[in-house]
A protein has these predicted regions:
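Conserved Nudix-box catalytic region and its N-terminal flanking loop in Nudix hydrolases
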Residues: 1-44, 51, 57, 85-95
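Nudix hydrolase/Nudix homology domain
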Residues: 16-23, 27, 56-67, 73-148
Length: 148
């Protein structure tokens, strides 16, 4: 089974916050379409951004993770822990034994921080939402793993 998970980002009191939503991918549906539906974003949302950031194997399913912003319903959010990262234990065993939601959200946010300075489409969207992107672009732009 494939699960589509969306980390929906918002800002409050100068802090990045997030919530996650997910659902099983129905047959014949593109993951991007389900992620857009789950995010609640529309083509009319100023600065709307949806980007695939990672995948992992969990509970007999492949989980495709997307980052989305701005959150159209920023209730029940939690603070983003941008330094929360997990890594595999060996070069030939890249998957960490477990990946918690905070690590997934941190990875997604750092991925967007990198795209803000490398992808002109994302940079254009970012220019319309400085309240969120100013916070995102302060994050380290490493997207996978970290040297400790």
């Amino acid at each position: 089974m494939t699960i589509v998970e969306v980390v929906v980002l918002s800002a409050s009191s100068g802090m990045l916050r997030y919530r996650t939503v997910s659902d099983a991918l129905p047959a014949g549906v593109h993951p991007d379409d389900l992620a857009l539906h789950l995010s609640g974003l529309t083509l009319c949302t100023p600065g709307a951004t949806l980007h695939s950031t990672s995948w992992r194997f969990a509970s007999e399913s492949v989980v495709l993770t997307y980052a989305a912003l701005p959150d159209p319903s920023p209730s029940a959010t939690v603070p983003l822990s941008p330094d929360r990262m997990v890594t595999g234990h060996a070069a030939l065993a890249p998957s960490p034994p477990s990946v918690d939601t905070d690590a997934v959200a941190a990875h997604a946010a750092r991925h967007l921080a990198l795209l803000a300075v490398t992808d002109p489409v994302i940079a254009a969207a970012a220019s319309t939402r400085p309240d969120l992107w100013d916070l995102l672009t302060k994050l380290p732009t490493g997207v996978a793993g970290a040297l400790r």
